[in-house]
Amino acid sequence: MRKFFESWPMAAVLWVWLTAGIIVEFNRFYPDLLFHPMGL
């Protein structure tokens, strides 16, 4: 089981899931900054 979690596909899925979670949480607290990064 340990070998499964150390595999590259699992690491990639975990990285994408973590990044998506950070973006979602950031967008929840600061909804305008994601769509207007330069203050336009």
From Swiss-Prot:
One cellular component (GO) term of this entry: photosystem I
Protein name: Photosystem I reaction center subunit IX
Signal peptide (from-to): none
NCBIfam families: PRK02733.1
Disulfide topology: none
Membrane protein topology class: Single-pass membrane protein
Family the entry assigns: Belongs to the PsaJ family.
Keyword Transferase included in the entry's annotation: no
Keywords: Membrane, Photosynthesis, Photosystem I, Thylakoid, Transmembrane, Transmembrane helix
Transmembrane regions: 4-24
Location(s), subcellular: Cellular thylakoid membrane
